[in-house]
Amino acid sequence: MLKNVEIYSKSNCLYCDKAKNYFSQNNIEYVLHDAEIPEVFDALMIRNPYARTMPQIFIDDELIGGYTDLEDWLQTKQD
């Protein structure tokens, strides 16, 4: 089971919604960070200065990346 999931998200973001839906449908709790708040965005830039897209997903403080990165990461965990 996945623990310590964090999602940096913005409104009107299809892939952000997909990530949140994945975790919700699989009963995985996550902390949602609103990247439209300047202080939250600044914190994201400290954690991942190369972030250019949303969402940005962290699991156990490990940067997973965006939604397609999450799909790839989950696939490697199933193999």
Per-region residue spans from a language model:
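Local sequence-structure signature of Cys/Sec-based thiol-disulfide redox active-site neighborhoods
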Residues: 1-28
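Short alpha-helical
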Residues: 14, 39, 65
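Alpha-helical elements of the RecA-like P-loop NTPase motor core of helicases
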Residues: 17, 42, 72
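Short, glycine/charged-enriched secondary-structure capping and boundary segments
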Residues: 21-23, 47, 71-73
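Conserved beta-strand positions in the Rossmann-like core of class I SAM-dependent methyltransferases
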Residues: 31
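Structural micro-motif
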Residues: 48-57, 67-68
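Non-catalytic, surface beta->alpha helical segment in thiol-disulfide oxidoreductase systems
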Residues: 59-79
